[in-house]
Amino acid sequence: MTTARNMGELAGFAIPRLGMGTMALAIEGRPDRDTAIRTIHAGLDAGVRYLDTAWSYYLPSQPGTGTAEDLGYGEKMVRDALASWDGPRDEVLIATKTGYRRTMEAPNVAENKPERQHLQAVGSQYGWMADSRPETMICDAKESAAHLGVEALDQIGRASCR
């Protein structure tokens, strides 16, 4: 196991030098769950102390609703990886994000201006729909805490693709 190093402090919290994003482990094209958890463990063992996830890291199942069979998949995977890791959990900073919903497809925004911004990942049939209304973000933050199995989030931000 590698000893973690920090960049410095912000508001009394240590900011880790090494971070790992988990989107590719949780959305379309993702590996199986055991492989994803082993990947997170390998990162943590190599000194990663910052894990980035998001409320919207799941596969969509109902167009435009944000409702999915595996809603919370990415955050729950991070929770399970940390629970099964034998390293110092208190040294790991978890950052999550809100502000987007998954959709079954992203319309061509040049042809049709949607009520909210829709984006599409390159090579993906699925899309992302912006939803940063305060009531949505508050609800997502509470759900994220539950998915991650914590009372308080280490860090939450608004997801942005621009």
Predicted segments with their positions:
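N-terminal binding-site loop/beta-alpha segment at the start of enzyme catalytic domains
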Residues: M1-L93, K97
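Distinct, well-ordered alpha-helical segments
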Residues: L71-S84, E105-V109, A141, G149, ...
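Glycine/proline-rich, positively charged
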Residues: V109-R162
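Glycine-rich, aromatic-flanked loop segments that form ligand/cofactor-binding clefts
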Residues: R89-N112
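Short, small-residue-enriched loops and turns at beta-alpha junctions
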Residues: Y58, R101-R102, S160-R162
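Aromatic- and acidic-residue-enriched segments that line the glycan-binding/catalytic groove
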Residues: P63-D70, E105-L119
